[in-house]
Amino acid sequence: MKRTTLSLFAGAAALAAVTGFAAVSAPGDTGAETVEPAARLPVERTSLLCPAPSASDLAETTYTSFTPVTEGAEEKGTATLTAAADGAGAEAGKGGEDAESGKDGEDAKDGEEGKDGKDGKDGEPVLRPGAPGTPVTGTASGADAPALTGTAEGSHAPGWTVQQTTEVAAGTGRGLLGLNCTAPDTEFWFPGASTASGRTDYVHLTNPDDSAAVVDIELYGKDGVLKSTVGEGVTVPPGGGESLLLSTLTDVEQTDVTVHVNVRSGRLGAAVQALDDKTGGDWLTAAADPAGELVVPGIPADATAVRLMLFTPGGSDADLKVRLASPSGAITPAGHETVHVKAGMTTGVDLGEVTRGEAGSLVLTPTSGSVPVVAAVRVVRGEGGEQESAFIPASDPVGARATAAENRAKGTTLSVTAPDRTAKVEVTASAGTEGGTTATKTFTIEGGTTQNVEVPVPAGLKGTYALTVETVSGGPVYAARTLTGEDEDVASFTVQPLPDDRGTVSVPKAEQNLSVLQQPPA
């Protein structure tokens, strides 16, 4: 997002410099022109990347694609989601052989086995998205489903969202695993990973481009960096999807690990698949960029255990206030009023049953000076042998609009929080994949609270549907959507934060002024 955003702004600035100018004058200038607000225009192209869903033969995966209707978007467009190129273990300097022939090599066959899968075979799209406003689904079975790369253009681009949901009936990582497929970027932070016994965590890398990408993978534990040369200079082939087992990158067992993925050349999609022998598994997606204030939205009301993981990448320690935004207001968890995060070290804090049967979101703010941190929580639901876990990273706000592609008539919970000011949001349910008409509701979220809102359901719903959340006034607001499994005897679930869906971009207001090209040199 960093490189793409900077390029976009640079291009807009260059365009303004050549064909016009945004009126900017110092205070007191005579003849100063009024600065007009930037216009928000629909994007014309969107790329998304989905990791290989599972190495389990029991895996059943559903992909749901949805583009919301966006005012001002082009009338025509296309979108496709196809299998990434074959891959059998990332190449990494001296560690390349180990990454290919060890345990990771065996389990990183997703890309290679994709050749024989019924979905994406011979370059055929896994699904072909329909018109904006109606979600479309595709499926894959077993361990041979590959990573996917997708591109949407024209009318299909603004806010294009793809949800990948996998159900695994048994074994390590059983349960419900879900994520929103991500846009390519150049840097990712994953607090919440682990190299402890009983955990099997992989970092998945997907390259959308026609040239190889080179990436460094750094691990940080409770005492600082976990030294390893295996994660340096990992090469991901053009259009390929790869996975690396974290325990092959270091021989140190750590309960809480922060993974830093830094792309030297090219761009990638990245996600961590965290599988637990006892509490199932889920995807750990990238946390919001390091910041002094963070929000972790949508902790389930019936969570039986919540563990907060934090990391500060700078050279200064961070001290943070910990608050839970509940339906009745901000609450300070007993015994965890503040947390101290040492520079370059991962800190884990057990918050227990912090939500106590109510909707909740964690709000982290500095006690004094602001120091950038990243954060995520691991949530456990259920009791005994029926427990399952999921991860919620700190998120960016909803912004203009956020989108959740896959929702069901039962088992969908939408959590919305306004950590500071009261906000009004509009929630719209799309038509269903097999039928139904849209429905909309508006909610007011009081400042400092979190509400599990009563989501609208399409009239005559058949299949699954999409939700959009739009900020009407106030805010900022943060949101997360929880899906629960259909088997009521097992606490399977997955949570996806809902940041802005990148459907529109701010373009400075410019006016024609060719005289800037005729001014004599200084």
Regions found by a protein language model. Give the residues of each.
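Long, internal scaffold/assembly segments composed of regular secondary structure
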Residues: 273, 280, 286-371
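C-terminal soluble interaction/assembly domains
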Residues: 428-487
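Short, aromatic- and glycine-rich surface loops/edge beta-strands on solvent-exposed regions
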Residues: 145-154, 162, 255-263, 359-367, ...
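Hydrophobic alpha-helical membrane segments, chiefly transmembrane helices and signal peptide h-regions
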Residues: 6-26, 259, 267-270, 324, ...
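Conserved functional hotspot residues at active sites or interaction interfaces
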Residues: 2-13, 20-72, 165-204, 269-313, ...
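Intrinsically disordered, low-complexity Pro/Gly/Ser/Thr-rich segments with frequent PxxP/GP/PP motifs
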Residues: 124-143, 225-254, 258, 330-357, ...
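Short acidic, flexible loop segments centered on an aromatic residue
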Residues: 205-225, 309-332, 366-368, 415-436, ...
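Extracytoplasmic low-complexity, Pro/Thr/Ser/Ala/Gly-rich segments
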Residues: 25-148, 152-156, 500-522
